[in-house]
């Protein structure tokens, strides 16, 4: 059975990619053929083949199957701004059909796929479509990444309510410590446990060096 998940966040810069890489590694260790997919990205670097996004590079490295840059990230914008705005200025339309084509291609090679969105749940793809409408179309199970910081509780509750109101399955949430641990961190998480109804998958600790992560020691569960 092929498992397909969509990673969203309560905000931008909540650590979606690092958590995605951990989930991909965990799924690989559980015996799955894994693939990370970032259909749309903004903010990149020059490569001989064009522009490529650092988040997409990490997803590619964290996948167990071999994927090309284009397979992981078919739509990449060099500047760091909302994709629908860059799409308008660069006259490069973002169509849901193109996102689906890339996903279908990866599905032929992998049985555990993690799709990373951009920003939060209602990030626009165009003037009429959002990532959420595409996720609903593809019937993906959503995982919420919550960065533990001031404001995260309200953002998390709103995000889960939006997903449920869109009649999409929320497979769980992960607390990501993006700042060094302080005395209130566990109180944030305890409050989230009281309010968020979706399964709690675990906590990602704060990392000083994200290039030296012991994946086996991170106690997060794979979504069902």
Swiss-Prot record:
Pathway: Cofactor biosynthesis; biotin biosynthesis; biotin from 7,8-diaminononanoate: step 1/2
EC code: 6.3.3.3
Active site: residue positions: 38
Superkingdom of this protein's organism: Bacteria
Keywords of the record: ATP-binding, Biotin biosynthesis, Cytoplasm, Ligase, Magnesium, Metal-binding, Nucleotide-binding
Record: residues binding Mg(2+): 17, 55, 116
Quaternary structure note: Homodimer.
NCBIfam families assigned: bioD (TIGR00347)
Record's protein name: ATP-dependent dethiobiotin synthetase BioD
Gene: bioD
């Amino acid at each position: 059975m092929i498992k397909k998940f969509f990673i969203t966040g309560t905000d931008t810069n909540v650590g979606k990619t690092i958590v995605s890489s951990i989930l991909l590694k965990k799924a690989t260790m559980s015996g799955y053929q894994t693939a990370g997919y970032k259909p749309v990205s903004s903010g990149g670097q020059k490569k001989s083949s064009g522009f490529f996004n650092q988040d997409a590079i990490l997803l590619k490295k964290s996948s167990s199957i071999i994927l090309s840059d284009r397979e992981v990230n078919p739509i990449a914008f060099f500047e760091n701004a909302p994709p629908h705005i860059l799409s308008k200025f660069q006259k490069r339309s973002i169509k849901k059909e193109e996102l689906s084509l890339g996903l279908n291609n990866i599905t032929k090679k992998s049985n555990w796929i993690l799709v990373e969105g951009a920003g939060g749940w209602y990030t626009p793809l165009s003037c009429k479509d959002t990532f959420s409408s595409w996720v609903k179309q593809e019937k993906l199970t959503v995982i919420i990444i919550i960065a533990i910081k001031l404001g995260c509780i309200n953002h998390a509750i709103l995000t889960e309510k939006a997903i449920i109101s869109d009649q999409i399955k929320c497979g769980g949430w992960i607390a990501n410590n993006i700042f060094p641990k302080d005395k209130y961190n566990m109180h944030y998480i305890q409050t989230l446990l009281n309010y968020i109804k979706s399964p709690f998958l675990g906590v990602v600790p704060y990392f000083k060096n994200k290039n030296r992560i012991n994946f086996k020691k991170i106690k997060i569960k794979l979504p069902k």
